[in-house]
A protein has these predicted regions:
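Nudix hydrolase/Nudix homology domain
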Residues: 1-122, 179-183, 246-302
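Short acidic-hydrophobic surface loop/beta-edge motif
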Residues: 60-66, 141-143, 160-162, 223
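Cys/His-rich short segments
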Residues: 111-163
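N-terminal strand-loop-strand
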Residues: 141-184, 189, 211-212, 235-237
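Active-site proximal loops enriched in glycine and acidic residues that flank catalytic Cys/His/Asp
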Residues: 174-175, 187, 216-221, 237, ...
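The catalytic Nudix box helix
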Residues: 184-219, 233
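Active-site-adjacent beta-strand/loop module that shapes the phosphate/pyrophosphate-binding cleft
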Residues: 221-244
């Protein structure tokens, strides 16, 4: 998956670090990042290209990969456009970076977007509208007027691979009103007051009207596009396989043969990685949770 950058080491410890000319600066416009792609390899501008230094005050340290520092900067559009003109740089959608390499640079550009999206929406206090200032000791925006503190937020969500044991088919869906039209697995965000296992039962019932059992935890993945932490689960159909599709969320859903699941060598997302496991019939390698007592809650959503 895209976050697997070993042997490189990602470190997100907060520090008041000043940029050096050889450090990397990540510059975003909407959901796109400024990048150069040469022979399939990604690179980002250096801080020196925009004269970012300790006196500029225009950047914030994000993280390091190995010993190399990455900064986020808000630079005047005219200055960026002048830099881009006649260069190999352009703005790429962060969601498309996975098609290139090296993996650590793909990860940097995608994770940088999570930081960018958070900082971009934390300019003013949500309580009193005073401009926020960055805390000096941790990654937190503080209101100098009312003291309100804003920490980075991750939104927990689930990806669910559902198998019908009686037919050995897998449930897939397509999102409604989205550009992405390939097969996906059932997915959704956790709501306040529920466990992540309860999220699985609720989302499956809401989106396709099914009950499931034997939840088996697979793995997690940070997902920058939605600032989410994804939890992957495999499970089995419990009862009737007839689908009641929520067309506000899904364009359609269907049971398909395992061999029909999309598969390629990238597997950059948790969804694609789980589809690979399902194609290879390896979901049984992951033991069901010792206690999954959400049957009654599941039924309450029918």
């Amino acid at each position: 998956m895209f976050q697997e950058i070993e042997p490189h080491v990602y470190c997100n410890d907060f520090a008041l670090v000043e940029p050096e000319s050889s450090d990397t600066v990540l510059i975003y416009r909407g959901d796109s990042v400024l990048v150069s792609v040469v022979d399939g390899l990604l690179s980002y501008p250096t801080c020196g290209a925009f004269a970012l230094d300790s006196s500029s005050g225009a950047s914030v340290f994000l993280f390091s990969i190995d010993s190399h520092a990455f900064f986020l900067a808000e630079i005047d559009d005219d200055e960026v456009d002048a830099f881009v003109k006649g260069s190999s740089y352009s703005f790429f959608r962060t969601g498309a970076l996975h098609a290139y390499g090296p993996q650590e640079n793909v990860f940097a550009g995608m994770m940088g977007y999570t930081y960018y999206a958070w900082y971009d929406t934390r300019r003013y206090c949500g309580r009193c509208a005073t401009p926020l200032v960055h805390d000096a000791t941790e990654r937190m925006m503080r209101c100098p007027s009312c003291g309100c503190m804003e920490f980075p937020k991750l939104f927990p969500a689930v990806i669910v691979g559902i198998v019908d044991p009686s037919t050995d088919r897998v449930l897939v869906s397509r999102y409604a009103n989205r550009e992405f039209k390939s097969y996906a697995l059932i997915a959704g965000f956790a709501e306040m007051g529920e466990t992540i296992e309860q999220t699985v039962h609720r989302e499956v019932m809401e989106e396709v009207g099914l009950r499931v059992k034997n939840l088996a935890y697979y793995t997690t993945q940070p997902w920058p596009v939605s600032s989410s932490l994804l939890f992957g689960f495999f499970c089995e159909l419990d009862g009737d396989s007839s689908l009641t599709v929520d067309h506000h969320e899904l364009e359609d859903a269907e049971w398909i043969l395992r061999e029909e699941l999309p598969c390629n060598d990238e597997n950059y997302s948790l969804t694609r990685d789980m589809m690979r496991v399902l194609r290879e019939r390896r979901e049984g390698d992951f033991a069901p949770l010792a206690a999954d007592n959400d049957t009654e809650r599941n039924r309450s959503h029918e």
